[in-house]
Structure formats: C-alpha cells, structure tokens
Amino acid sequence: IDGRQLNVTNYVNLLYGDAMSYTIGLAEYEGNTRSFTSTGESIVLDKVEDFQENPIHKNLVLDVGGQKVGYLMYNQFLNEFDDQLIQTFSDFAAEGITDLVLDLRYNGGGSVLTCVYLASMITGQFTGEIFAQQIWNSKLLAYFEALNSNTNDTDDRELNNYFTNTTSEGVTLPALNLSNVYIIATNRSASASELLINGLAPHINVVLIGNTTYGKNVGSITVYDYIDNEGNKNPNHTYAMQPIVLKIANSVGFADYANGLDPDIELRESASNLGVLGSTTEPLLYMALNQITGSGKYLVPQGKVLNPMTDPEFEATNGMHIDLPQNTLKDFLKN
C-alpha cells in the first residue's frame, strides 16, 4: 500500500488512515509455498465519503446440471433497496428457479423488516406465522402486552415479526415457496443475517456453508430528538442514539447464538482459496452447488488457509435495527 509492505501490524494505519487515495500493489498467491509474489502492477483507489453501496451485489440464474439455481449475493439489509430486492425475487420466480444460494458472507446486518421480507420471499407458504420474537425487558414486555390487550390485538405485532405476502406499503411480495435454502456465511455475517438463518430454521431446511457466524442476537432502535408527535425532528440536533434494547428469537424461542451459528459444511474463505464472486468455481458457491446437485465433491484450497485480519470498521457497521411505529415508545415513556 503506497509502496509499503502490508502486514498484520500496519494494515490498520495504511488502510484506515486519513489518506484520500491509495496505490495498491498487486501480487499472486502461491499455494505450495504459501507466499505472495509481486506482479509489478498497481491500481489507484480514491476514497469516497458517504457512498451507499447497492447491497444486491450479484444476482444470477445458474444452469447447474439442468437445474435452475438462483444466486444472490446480498451485502446489507437496507430498506432503501427493498424495491430492487423484490424485483430480484420476481425475476427468480419468472425464471422458475428450483433452488437458491443466498450469499451473506459479507453481510453485517440491517433492517429487521427487510429481513422479514426476504424470508417471506424465500418461502411464501408461511404467511401469518411467526418468523421471529422480540424479547424486551420486563417493563416493555408488560407495556406491549397491555397495549395489545387494550386494542384486542391478538397477534402481538409489537413483539413478533410475521411472515408476510405484502410490504407495509401494500406491495405484493413474490414467493419462491422453497423448502430448502443454501446460505453462505462467515464470521462477518451478523445480526439480521443471523436472524434470517435462525428465523428460517424451524420452517425449512437451511444448509449453512462457510464458517461460524459473528454471534449478534440483539437489536437496536433509533432514538431521535422529536419536537412533536408527528415525527418531526429537532433541526438543531443532528445526532441520534442507537441503543441495543432487545434480543430476537425464532418462532420456537431459540435466541442463544451469541457465539455464532455453526455451519453444516465448514469452508473458510481465505487468500489461499479466493475465486471470482458469482463464478461456479468460486469455492463457497461451488460447495453450495454440489449440495444441490448431490455430487458431494469438495474443492480443497491450495496450501494453508490463512487467518483473516480483523476489520476495525466492521464493529461499527454491523447491526440489526427495528422500525417501531412513531408513537410506540413515546407513549410508553409518558407513562
């Protein structure tokens, strides 16, 4: 990086410093000797602030042994991109896919509501059934239960998340009606990614491929300085709070995955086995496709699997948040 050799002690300063551009030297990895050799080539990357990535990084329909397999690499649960996510599943349904590989290897979480939509589109046969249960502290649990009792609301929507066939705006969700899903996950898969895996598990067969997930089974809400009951924010306050306020369980009450969710098939992503994302020869996707076709073949990475470096930005960006009706907590705080 900028003419300096990257190592485990300097990578944070080199990659996460104040520089607005980087010159990155390229190298090839030699599996037999477990070493890198410079190619003499380099690329220049310019830093862009406030850039919002489209979380739908790859969406493909693969013909694998005569079977149509959908592949979606999804990097964050962002409700701003729900329309694109819905369109992706509409395309999958139109193509008549019979299996789905969902790649969450870099997905640190996001909106619970978007997670519910995704789970509902993967399935479709569980509309109205519980997908996830929110476990709040005793005071808020009592408040929500009393609120539902007073309004004769029997489905506890303040506490539970249900499979649905429409969005909150009334948009119809496409459904694949799958009974199996193959999910690629790593230790960077956190929060809403883990909620999706855990929430689907009691309902369909979830085959988890990769390594143990991050282990974040809690959720947060955004607390603004509202100046009225109409949702208008104080223009003088540009910050908000994001407290962790709840734990989320699946429909059978399981929420104890603070140490992560273990894979059914373990295969670590490493510099020793990197492939092209979306390629059928990329090791993790290759393994998922082999589970679908039943070939059972295994790609052995060349050389030792290298331990990944810790990303100091990941702790700040992974998370799971829920969207409550505007007055729900405000009314509680008045009591």
Language-model-detected regions and their locations in the chain:
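Active-site-proximal loop/turn and secondary-structure-junction residues that shape catalytic pockets
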Residues: 49, 106-108
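Terminal peptide-recognition signature
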Residues: 1-2, 24-25, 72, 102, ...
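C-terminal "post-core" interaction segments
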Residues: 66-72, 76-99, 108-335
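C-terminal, low-ordered peptide segments at domain boundaries
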Residues: 5-97
